[in-house]
Amino acid sequence: MKNGTVKFFNESKGFGFIIEESSSNEYFVHVSGLIDRISEGDNVEFELKEGKKGLNAINVKVI
């Protein structure tokens, strides 16, 4: 599992971005990849999965 912070999440559109703590890489997150409801600034744990446009955050949960 990786740790990061929610940079942005648009609930009405169902997507956002997470910044990984250790590398500062930014990853796309879709509502379908959430375990918990997230908001901007939340500290989260997540896994990565290859998507159509690169790596996506999945199994995202607030820590």
What positions do the PLM features span?
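Short aromatic-glycine-enriched beta-strand elements
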Residues: 13-18
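Structural detector for short beta-strands of small beta-barrel domains
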Residues: 1-8
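A generic beta-sheet turn/junction motif
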Residues: 10, 22, 50-52
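Short nucleic-acid-contacting surface segments enriched for D/E, G, S/T with interspersed K/R
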Residues: 34-45
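Well-ordered beta-strand positions in beta-sheet-rich domains
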Residues: 3, 26-28, 43
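OB-fold/S1-family single-stranded nucleic acid-binding modules
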Residues: 49-63
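Beta-strand/loop nucleic-acid-binding surfaces
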Residues: 24-36
